Amino acid sequence: MNKTEFIAFMTEHGHHHKHQGHKSFTKADAEKALNWVLESIISATKHQHSVNITGFGSFGIQSRKSREGRNPKTGAKMTIPAYKQPVFKAGSKLKEACNNK
């Protein structure tokens, strides 16, 4: 499911809750909310903060050391520089949902 499909899913899911007394929201509202959450997670991790959403999972940064590697085309040795890797660790509720528990 890509972002556009997910926004449509959020909107349809919102209409499902309308019957339970909740207000529905538009695709524009869903896109704005999703963008705000994603931008907030990116900003927090960029500033070296981890984001923990209980049950869902945690977003963070892992530092990777520089290391030796090889150019796949030429086979020549090369140094792969150190870098920071974004990471996500799934929480218990997400794991349970994926395993139909």
UniProtKB/Swiss-Prot annotation:
Q: GO CC terms on record?
A: cytosol
Q: Which InterPro entries does the entry mention?
A: Hist_DNA-bd, Histone-like_DNA-bd_CS, IHF-like_DNA-bd_dom_sf
**Would the keyword Signal be found if you checked this record's keyword annotation?**
no
Source taxon at top rank:
Bacteria
Q: For this UniProt record, give its keywords in alphabetical order, as a comma-separated list.
A: DNA condensation, DNA-binding
Under the heading SUPFAM superfamilies, the entry gives: IHF-like DNA-binding proteins
Q: What are the recorded Gene Ontology BP terms?
A: chromosome condensation
Query: Recorded GO terms, molecular function?
Result: DNA binding; structural constituent of chromatin
The yes or no answer to whether the keyword Signal is present is: no
UniProt subunit comment: Homodimer.
Q: State the similarity comment.
A: Belongs to the bacterial histone-like protein family.
Role of this protein:
Histone-like DNA-binding protein which is capable of wrapping DNA to stabilize it, and thus to prevent its denaturation under extreme environmental conditions.
This chain belongs to the protein called DNA-binding protein HU
Show the taxonomic lineage.
Bacteria, Pseudomonadati, Pseudomonadota, Alphaproteobacteria, Rickettsiales
Gene of this entry: hup
